[in-house]
């Protein structure tokens, strides 16, 4: 009898244990598979590119701008404080950071050049989008967006060369979810002139750079720019929310940056920080934080990074050959080396205005060499005369002798052949230290670095465009006659 009871108890225990194991197995089977990340899966890459935008976000310390979405993105990712484009104008800059090559090396340095002469990229140089396509990435430059957003992407490319194949495979957001992994861009026009955005910033409270006169026109213009930045942020928020709603956020690296500096008189088209220094924020989902520099949310990175480094970095991270042949260098990933000691920039013809400027910047100093110093900073430029209210204000105040000492260089008849600035002591680059004997050696060091860069990268800037081509803004065929000042105002984009 006792043996029968013991056997019965053993059978019950075995049955209970079996049921418990089956129940546990059932619970495990019911766990969402989304919580397990396949680290061999290639991440999606989404670039959010703002036109003509400096580091004027709340997370960079700018006042009177409302940027909660980009500030949150910075809190969840890495914010770079010393990220520089290699050109202060869109077409040359984009030609560089989409190839990972200096625009001066590949013949793409003059603004909007080679549009009608069939010019192609040098052998071995490719767009990042084409490299990623070969690695199985679907590529898109988004124009068509969800109707609920209420806006479209600009689809801007603006390259100074001709392609045999389209730069991207699609322009539709709706294609992304069904074509992974993807590399996509959304280009935002909000911070490109003319500024059109709801009013938020108080002109009386905006922080205007000290080289501009403290004038109502200046304050209004700067406030409108910051309002455009706030509107840009609102639209970025819609993109990030859509990414999450579609379940794409956990496998998408999001990159936000500016294509060149802000469209102000001493910004865009010039080789100061105001023309070359732009924001860079990268958000890496926790599921794919495998490489160094990707591990800490809310990190602030103060290394020097060039925009051409983006192509090299994402080519490397996608495990695509060719990154080691670029001028850019990876700044994230297993093969990223020490950070840069110097970044370089160049400005050549923009519109009808011919300048040749070269610059090298270290962490603390900037050296600028002007090969065309006979011209004024306010050299004739139809685009700026029509769209920059401060441009014309400066001329008016100069005629009335109402400009302060920091603004006078803006209206001088010529520009210095050389400029040298201490960015730590003088972040707005207002005090030219080129003749300071105490800095003789450090200036010489920067001169040598620029000479070395010009030589080693085979800078093509010394080969000037034919005069007629320059006059026609890069066209080899005559341009159609321009409209009169009133009708054309605000029409021309650059």
Question: What is each residue range found by the language model?
Answer:
Residues 2, 27-418, 427-448, 452-455, ...:
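Formylglycine-dependent sulfatase
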Residues 12-26:
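Bacterial N-terminal signal peptides
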Residues 462-476:
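Short, charged, surface-exposed hinge/linker loops at domain edges
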Residues 423-425:
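Extracellular, beta-strand-rich glycan-interacting domains
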Residues 1-11:
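N-terminal secretory signal peptides that target proteins for export/translocation
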């Amino acid at each position: 009898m006792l043996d029968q009871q013991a056997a019965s108890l053993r059978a019950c225990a075995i049955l209970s244990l079996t049921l418990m194991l089956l129940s546990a197995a059932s619970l495990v089977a019911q766990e969402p598979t989304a919580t397990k990340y396949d680290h061999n899966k290639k991440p999606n890459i989404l670039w959010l590119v703002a036109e003509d935008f400096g580091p004027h976000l709340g997370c960079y310390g700018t006042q009177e701008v409302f940027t909660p979405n980009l500030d949150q993105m910075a809190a969840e990712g890495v914010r770079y404080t010393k990220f520089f484009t290699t050109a202060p104008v869109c077409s040359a800059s984009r030609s560089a950071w989409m190839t990972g090559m200096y625009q001066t090396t590949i013949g793409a340095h003059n603004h909007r050049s080679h549009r009608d002469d069939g010019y192609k990229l040098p052998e071995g140089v490719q767009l990042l989008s084409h490299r990623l396509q070969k690695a199985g990435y679907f590529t898109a430059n988004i124009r068509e967006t969800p109707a609920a957003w209420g806006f479209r992407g600009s689809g801007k490319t603006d390259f100074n060369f001709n392609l045999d194949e389209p730069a991207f495979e699609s322009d539709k957001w709706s294609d992304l979810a069904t074509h992974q992994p993807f590399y996509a861009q959304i280009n935002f026009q909000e911070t490109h002139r003319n500024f059109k955005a709801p009013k938020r910033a108080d002109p009386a409270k905006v922080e205007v750079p000290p080289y501009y006169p403290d004038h109502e026109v200046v304050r209004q213009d700067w406030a409108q720019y910051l309002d455009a930045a706030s509107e840009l942020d609102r639209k970025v928020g819609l993109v990030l929310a859509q990414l999450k709603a579609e379940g794409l956020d956990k496998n998408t690296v999001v990159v936000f940056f500016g294509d060149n500096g802000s469209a102000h008189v001493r910004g865009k088209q010039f080789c100061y920080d105001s023309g070359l220094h732009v924001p860079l924020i990268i958000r890496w989902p926790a599921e794919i934080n495998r490489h160094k520099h990707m591990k800490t949310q809310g990190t602030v990175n103060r290394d020097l990074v060039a925009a051409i480094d983006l192509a090299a970095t994402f080519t490397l991270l996608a495990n695509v050959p060719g990154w080691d042949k670029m001028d850019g260098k990876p700044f994230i990933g297993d093969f990223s080396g020490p950070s840069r000691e110097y970044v370089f920039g160049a400005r050549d013809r923009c519109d009808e205005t011919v300048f040749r400027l070269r610059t090298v910047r270290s962490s603390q100093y900037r050296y600028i060499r002007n090969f065309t110093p006979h011209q004024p900073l306010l050299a004739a430029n139809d685009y700026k005369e029509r769209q920059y209210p401060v441009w014309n204000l400066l001329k008016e105040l100069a005629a009335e002798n109402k400009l302060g000492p920091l603004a006078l260089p803006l209206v001088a008849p010529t520009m210095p052949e050389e400029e040298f600035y201490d960015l730590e002591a003088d972040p707005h680059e207002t005090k030219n230290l080129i003749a300071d004997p105490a800095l003789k050696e450090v200036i010489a060091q920067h001169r040598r670095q620029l000479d070395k860069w010009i030589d080693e990268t085979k800078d093509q800037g010394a080969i000037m465009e034919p005069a007629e081509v320059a006059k026609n803004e890069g066209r080899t065929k005559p341009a159609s006659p321009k409209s009169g000042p009133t009708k054309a105002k605000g029409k021309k984009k650059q």
